[in-house]
Amino acid sequence: MKRIYGSLAIAALALAATPAFAQIKIASVGPMTGQYAAFGEQLRRGAEMAVADINAAGGVNGQKVELSIGDDACDPKQATAVANKMVSDKVVFVAGHYCSGSSIPASDIYKEAKILQITPASTNIKLTDDAFAKGNTTVFRTCGRDDVQGLTVGTYVLKWHRNAKVAILHDKSPYGKGVADETKKALNKGGMREAMYEAYNDTDKDFTALINKMKQAKIDIIVLGGYHTAGALLIKQSREQGFGAQMVGFDALEDAEFAKLGGAATNGVLMSFPPKAEDDPKNAALVKKFRDAKYEPAGYTLFTYAAVKVWAEAATKAKSIEAAKVAAALRAGTFDSAVGPLTYDQKGDIKNPVYDIYIWKDGKSLPTPK
C-alpha cells in the first residue's frame, strides 16, 4: 500500500507541475516610444485583439497564446537587442517590426533562433530578397513592397504630372530611401527625370534651406520618402513660406498624427496605401470591437491583426508551432484575412499586392478617384 500511495503522490506532484493550459509565447515588436510611437500603437492594438480572439476560440493546437510587446523605437541597435530578448524569452513568432531598418537586422537573429517573423508594415524589398538569398525562409509580410509602392506613385505622377518638375526626397532610412529609389526607377523608366534628388535627416526640425532650394528649382511635385513627423513639418513650413508644391508620400504618412502635426497644410497631400481594411464591410464587426475599445483601427492595425491570425491558422494547419513547418503551411495555401486573401511566394511576399492613392482632407486620408 505504501508503494501505491507513493506512486500516487508522485503522479499528483507531476500533474501539479504541469500547467492546465500551456502557453505559446509570441510577440509584437515596433516603435512603442519615440517619434513613431503612433505606429507602434497600431501594431500593439492589432496584435492584442488578434490574441484575444484566438484564445477565445480555443487557442492554437490546444494551447493558449501569450503575447509580449517589444519596443525597438525604430532603431536598428534597439531592434537587435529586443530580438535577442525574444530569443531568451522563447518566443516562437514575432509580428513585426514596423520600420524596415529594424526588421532587416532582427530577421537574422530570428532566423538563427528559428522564430517565424511576419511584418505587417516593413516594405523594403531587401527584407525578403536578402533573407531568401541567405536561405532564410521564415520571413513574411502582410503588406506589399517598396517596388509596388514606387510603381504606384510613379505611375500616378507620370499620368497626371508628366511635365512637372519633381523633387525626390528621402530621410536616409532603408524605408525612406527604398520608396524614393523605387519611385525614381518608375519615373525614369517612363521617360521622366527628377529635377532634384535630396536627402534630409528624420530628426530635422527646420526645412527652410531645403524649401528655398526647391523654390529656386521651381519644383511642382515633392515625392517624400519618409515618415509622418518630418513630412508634417515639411509641408507645414512649405505653406508658411509660400511654397505650394504638391506633396506625394507613402504609407508612413497614414496616421492621424500627420494631420495633427501639419494642420491645414496637410489638406491635399497625396500618399500611397493598400486598400483600407477598416472600410471593408466584411470587417464591420471586427472594426466595431476596436471602436468599442475607444480605438480607431487605422493604418497597420488590421495588418498586424492579420499577421497574428494568419500565423495561428498556419500553425493549426501544420499542427506545429515550429517555424519551418508553419512557413511551409503559409506557402501551401491562401489565407482569408482581415486585409484580404493572402497567398505567399517563395520569398515570403504576398502575391499581387495592391496600393491605391489617397488624399488628406480635414484630418483624414480619403480614396482618390480611380
Q: What residues fall within each predicted segment?
A:
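Segments of small-molecule ligand-sensing domains
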Residues: 290-301, 310-368
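Short beta-strand elements in bilobed, periplasmic/extracellular small-molecule ligand-binding domains
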Residues: 60-72, 135-138, 188-202, 272
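Hydrophobic alpha-helical segments within soluble ligand-binding/sensing domains
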Residues: 79, 141-165, 206-207, 231-232, ...
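Extracellular/periplasmic periplasmic-binding protein-like sensory domains
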Residues: 235-305, 364-368
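Beta-alpha junction/loop-to-helix N-cap segments that form part of ligand/metal-binding clefts
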Residues: 38-43, 57-129, 200-207, 232, ...
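Extracytoplasmic ligand/sensor domains, especially the bilobed periplasmic-binding protein
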Residues: 88-196, 246-268
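Extracytoplasmic "Venus flytrap"
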Residues: 27-46, 70-77, 98-101, 169-177, ...
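Sec/Tat signal peptide C-region and signal peptidase I cleavage site
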Residues: 18-22
